[in-house]
C-alpha cells in the first residue's frame, strides 16, 4: 500500500525563523513538539499523539541516532544542515524500525551541488528577559566534473534562562551549543559513488534557579553536558542505466554525557 509522506522544506524553516529541527517540526500537521522538563528543557516529539519513544528519527534514511541522543537530538540538529525533512505518520512507518509505531522523521542533509557559501545570524528575545543568539554558516565546494564535492556547516546557539511566572525557577533553561559537520562524496566511475559524513555537537544546558551559583549551591539544578561525535560511510553501485542499485553503509556514534 502507498505511504503518505509529508515534506518540511527549507521555506517552512525560513518563514518561521527556525534555527533547529524542533522549531520547524511544530508547523507540521499531526506533529507536536513539547518541552517535558522545565529544568533540563528537553523537547519531545509526538506523532499522532504518541510519545517520543514511539517515533523513529532517521538521518538520510538510516537510524544512526541512538535512543539517548534522540531525547535532546531535536534541538541539536541545526537548520543549516537540513535539505528537507520527510515525515511519515501512522503504523506503516514501523517498516523503518520497531519503535516507529507513531511515525518516522527522516532528515535529509544538504548535498554539495555547487560552489557556494552562506552566513546567517539571528537575535531573539522572550518577554524582554531571555535573549537568544544564533549564528550559522555553510560552505560547498564541487569539482568542475562533479567527480567529488564537500559541504561543511557550523552553527552556534546561546540562550539565557527564561522564567515566565517570576518564581525564580526557569521554564526554559540556559543553553549553549556548538555544532560542526560535513558531507562529502567521490565518484570513482559514472556508476558508483562513495559518501562520507560526520558531525559533532558540544552542548551545555542547565535549568533550575540561582544560575550565578554553582549547581550544588542552588535550591534545584539539573545540568547536562553532551559531546556527540557521529559519522558514516556508504558505497552506491548502479547498473543497467541506473535501474538497479546496491548500497552498503556503516555508521558509528560516540556520546559523552555528564548529568548533574
Where do the language-model regions lie?
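N-terminal periplasmic "start-of-domain" segments of outer-membrane beta-barrel proteins
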Residues: 1-14, 44, 52
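Extracytoplasmic beta-strand/coil segments of soluble accessory domains associated
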Residues: 22-63, 83
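Transmembrane beta-barrel domains of outer membrane proteins
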Residues: 24, 48, 88, 108, ...
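Short acidic/polar hinge/loop motifs at secondary-structure boundaries
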Residues: 44-46, 62-89, 110
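Strand-connecting loop/turn motifs
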Residues: 54, 112-116, 143-147, 189-193, ...
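Residue-level detector of the transmembrane beta-barrel scaffold of outer-membrane proteins
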Residues: 56-58, 116-120, 149-153, 193-197, ...
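Outer-membrane beta-barrel translocator/receptor signature
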Residues: 66-68, 81-83, 94-106, 110-165, ...
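Flexible loop and strand-edge segments within Gram-negative outer membrane beta-barrel domains
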Residues: 159-179, 185-187, 191-245, 252-257
Amino acid at each position: 500500500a502507498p505511504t503518505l509522506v509529508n515534506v518540511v522544506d527549507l521555506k517552512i524553516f525560513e518563514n518561521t525563523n527556525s534555527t533547529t529541527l524542533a522549531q520547524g517540526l511544530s508547523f507540521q500537521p499531526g506533529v507536536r513538539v513539547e518541552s517535558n522538563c522545565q529544568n533540563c528543557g528537553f523537547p519531545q516529539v509526538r506523532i499522532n499523539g504518541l510519545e517520543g519513544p514511539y517515533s523513529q528519527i532517521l538521518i538520510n534514511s538510516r537510524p544512526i541516532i541512538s535512543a539517548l541522543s534522540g531525547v535532546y537530538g531535536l534541538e541539536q540538529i541545526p537548520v543549516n544542515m537540513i535539505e528537507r525533512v520527510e515525515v511519515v505518520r501512522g503504523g506503516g512507518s514501523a517498516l523503518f524500525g520497531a519503535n516507529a509505531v507513531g511515525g518516522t522523521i527522516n532528515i535529509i542533509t544538504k548535498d554539495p551541488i555547487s560552489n557556494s557559501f552562506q552566513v546567517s545570524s539571528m537575535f531573539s528575545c522572550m518577554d524582554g528577559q531571555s535573549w537568544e543568539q544564533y549564528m550559522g554558516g555553510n560552505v560547498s565546494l564541487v569539482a568542475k566534473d562533479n567527480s567529488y564535492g564537500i559541504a561543511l556547516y557550523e552553527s552556534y546557539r546561546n540562550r539565557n534562562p527564561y522564567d515566565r511566572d517570576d518564581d525564580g525557577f526557569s521554564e526554559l533553561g540556559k543553553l549553549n551549543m556548538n555544532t560542526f559537520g560535513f558531507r562529502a562524496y567521490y565518484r570513482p566511475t559514472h556508476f558508483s559513488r562513495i559518501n562520507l559524513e560526520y558531525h559533532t555537537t558540544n552542548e551545555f544546558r542547565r535549568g533550575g534557579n540561582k544560575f550565578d551559583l554553582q549547581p550544588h549551591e542552588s535550591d534545584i539544578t539539573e545540568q547536562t553536558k553532551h559531546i556527540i561525535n557521529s559519522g558514516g560511510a556508504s558505497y552506491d553501485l548502479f547498473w543497467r542505466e541506473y535501474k538497479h542499485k546496491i548500497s552498503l553503509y556503516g555508521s558509528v556514534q560516540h556520546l559523552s554525557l555528564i548529568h548533574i
